[in-house]
């Protein structure tokens, strides 16, 4: 049988066709526009997502036996606000995860309602990207549009609705709305009241691997597929990507070294730290996960190489780095402020510890180590909750550097596994479709059978000890400079 994974991203929808053994048969990508109607705003037209997804599916299955397509599922950009009226028409363009218009509403939630209350209701605090502040913004700034709202949904769920007619979402994606009681897996009555919405306006909740419906007859006819093709709920992009890397089960970890950096830790038990330093969300395997987000990860190295050293020879610049764990230079990786664990938009990147004999290689090494130390900050929060973590998967552009992987393995004292294929949320979506269609009994079984580890970087005991001492020094730098950062414009 064949399964389709739909990765609804910010710049394009990426569609993946997978067979029952996990083999990738074809990948198609279709772009759409991103709109910035005012400084700091970021919007897209849900109709564009749908039209491009339909075109993408047609191209994806153009050369296969269409009778073999059994299911479709999703991994999608999180937090975006999609609103429909009583006629199922889109009321206004979707307000996306990276839209910054809701700082006033975010401050209201965190300071007036209070972070403790928000954590009690949802296991999280408010961020400008989350969905609930967007709803409050609509109520205040577009009351006519707000009063038209019949359905509130997330980006990938708009596709599921168009394909199946089922008004649905999954727990992992709903966790990022600030409307879900993450621990008890239900909509929070308190948050609905705060936002002025009813449960009837919110989608029905499903596990990521559950079937929400089948293709509508007219859609099936247009695509040339059976109307028995199952639509599976899918997951938010980070949870779907975690499925695609096999990060399911207790204490499993994945580090993504992209422009931003994430550390994703799956757990069979619910946990939330007292400072809400990590996001506490439901996971696509039916359990939970913690996630730390660094706003600048591989982008730190790109900035250092491109803007300061004026070179594209990234690998060559790392060749002279040999004295791991002995660097006297430290780098705080806060080029865009920081999310986890400090939640400080005013934090700034900093070099400290240079002297007259500091070399180019030591500065480059400090950048790589600073990102690793920043990831370790989030790891320590998870460990403080009693989660035992011994190894991690790694993906993203920065993971192509052997040196960076070695540094991370020793800074974090984790075995670092490199996987065979890295296709992110689309592959995770296809895996969820296979589980939903009964190809596998569980997400865990699918991950165990389909995700292949091709290399492991082992930590070295001597280097681990050296980096432990360096990390303890690193931890003292941000608190010492926090007050200074607050004075910067």
Locate predicted features.
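Short glycine-/acidic-enriched loop or helix-start segments at secondary-structure transitions
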Residues: 15, 81-84, 93, 265-266, ...
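Gly-rich Lys/Arg/Thr-decorated short loops/hinges at beta-loop-alpha junctions or inter-strand turns
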Residues: 33-43, 117-118, 168-175, 198-201, ...
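Short beta-strand-loop/turn "lid" adjacent to the catalytic site in phosphate-handling enzymes
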Residues: 58-97, 125-131, 160-181, 204-207, ...
């Amino acid at each position: 049988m064949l399964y389709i994974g739909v990765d609804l991203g910010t710049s394009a929808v990426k569609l993946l066709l997978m067979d029952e053994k996990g083999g990738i048969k074809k990948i198609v990508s279709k772009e759409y526009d991103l709109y910035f109607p005012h400084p700091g705003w970021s919007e897209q037209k849900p109709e564009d997502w749908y039209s491009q997804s339909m075109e993408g599916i047609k191209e994806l299955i153009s050369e296969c036996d269409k009778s073999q397509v059994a299911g479709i599922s999703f991994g999608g950009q999180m937090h975006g606000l999609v609103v429909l009226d009583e006629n199922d028409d889109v009321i206004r363009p979707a307000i996306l995860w990276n839209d910054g218009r809701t700082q006033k509403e975010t401050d209201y939630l965190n300071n007036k309602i209070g972070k403790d209350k928000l954590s009690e209701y949802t296991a999280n605090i408010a961020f400008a990207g989350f969905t609930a502040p967007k709803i409050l913004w609509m109520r205040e700034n577009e009351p006519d549009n707000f009063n038209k709202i019949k359905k509130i949904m997330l980006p990938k769920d708009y596709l599921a609705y168009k394909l199946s007619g089922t008004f649905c979402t999954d727990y992992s994606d709903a966790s990022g709305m600030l409307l879900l009681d993450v621990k008890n897996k239900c909509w929070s009555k308190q948050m609905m009241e705060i936002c002025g919405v009813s449960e009837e306006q919110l989608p029905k909740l499903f596990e990521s691997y559950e079937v929400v419906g089948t293709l509508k007859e007219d859609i099936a006819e247009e695509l040339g597929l059976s109307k028995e093709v199952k639509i599976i709920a899918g997951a938010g992009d980070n949870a779907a990507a975690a499925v695609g890397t096999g990060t399911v089960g207790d204490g499993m970890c994945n580090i993504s070294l992209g422009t931003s950096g994430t550390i994703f830790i799956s757990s069979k038990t619910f946990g939330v730290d007292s400072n809400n330093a990590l996001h506490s969300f439901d996971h696509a395997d039916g359990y939970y996960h913690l996630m730390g987000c660094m706003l600048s990860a591989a982008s730190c190295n790109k900035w250092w190489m491109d803007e300061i050293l004026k070179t594209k020879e990234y690998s060559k610049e790392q060749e002279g780095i040999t004295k791991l764990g002995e660097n006297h230079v430290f780098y705080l990786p806060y080029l865009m402020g920081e999310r986890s664990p400090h939640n400080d938009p005013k934090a700034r990147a900093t070099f400290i510890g240079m002297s007259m004999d500091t070399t180019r290689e030591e500065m480059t090494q400090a950048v790589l180590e600073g990102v690793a130390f920043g990831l370790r900050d989030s790891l320590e929060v998870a460990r403080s909750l009693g989660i035992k973590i011994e190894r991690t998967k790694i993906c993203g552009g920065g993971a192509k550097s052997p040196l960076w992987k070695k540094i991370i393995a020793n800074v974090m004292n984790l075995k670092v596994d490199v996987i065979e294929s890295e296709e992110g949320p689309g592959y995770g979506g296809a895996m969820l479709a296979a589980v939903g269609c009964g190809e596998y009994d569980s997400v865990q079984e699918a991950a165990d059978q389909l995700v292949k580890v091709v290399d492991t970087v082992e930590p070295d005991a001597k280097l681990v000890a050296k980096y432990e001492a360096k990390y303890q020094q690193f931890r003292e730098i941000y608190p010492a400079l926090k007050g200074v950062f607050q004075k910067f414009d």
